[in-house]
């Protein structure tokens, strides 16, 4: 199986690249002509389209839409014309604050990309809050777990917002499952999460880190108070294997060994 992977230097893309026997990584900056030349020369059996602007607070409309939507269209069109499998990294950000529509530019860009991929017969995987080994380079876009795991005390938003934290191994397994079962899964979206909704307080209790609360006025506009993947929206036959307690333990061990 020959795989082309966009975002191959990133958190998820790098893991997928290591699993595929024959694969190429496609960088973040490319023209349509450069993209098509690379794909035509390599002739992949599948494209994992992971690369994106992942900054949920970015308000540069031209940049976000070019990166997350226009380039997705290029890839989806090439895969459609050449009858190549396409697995697209979507996001739970498309649910926004009211569970119906995105509440920021990032969410809208991912929804547009997802719709286009599905209409071309691809698979869209809506990732929830991914965490685990390998996200160190993401900086402010790394999970809250990584950003605070070495601190003695953290500041949290009030009202106990919740997240569906999903371990990186389960996200990788979801991509491989989608590939292996492509023909029966293609043409729609699926959620990739743990199926459990956890407060940030639960995270830091597991880590033994103290916390205090920010003022309610500091909660930004468009902030999702709750996210949760539903098992009915998972790929039939796929399920995550790493629960929160297990994932936190593994992640902490990994970071301790690196320091």
Go through each PLM region and give its residues:
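N-terminal Rossmann NAD(P)H-binding glycine-rich loop of SDR-like oxidoreductase domains
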Residues: 3-20
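C-terminal substrate-binding subdomain of Rossmann-fold SDR/epimerase-dehydratase oxidoreductases
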Residues: 7, 150-259
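Active-site segment of SDR-like NAD(P)-dependent oxidoreductases
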Residues: 9, 53-55, 91-99, 128-131
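Adenosine-cofactor binding site in Rossmann-like domains, unifying the SAM/SAH pocket
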Residues: 21-39
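NAD(P)H-binding glycine-rich loop region in Rossmannoid oxidoreductase-like domains
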Residues: 35-67, 93-97
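Conserved Rossmann-fold NAD(P)-dependent oxidoreductase catalytic core, especially the SDR/UDP-sugar
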Residues: 49, 73-105, 123
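Glycine-rich NAD(P)-binding loop of the Rossmann-fold in SDR/ketoreductase-type enzymes
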Residues: 63-74, 104, 108-109
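NAD(P)-dependent short-chain dehydrogenase/reductase
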Residues: 103-107, 115-163, 168-172, 206-207
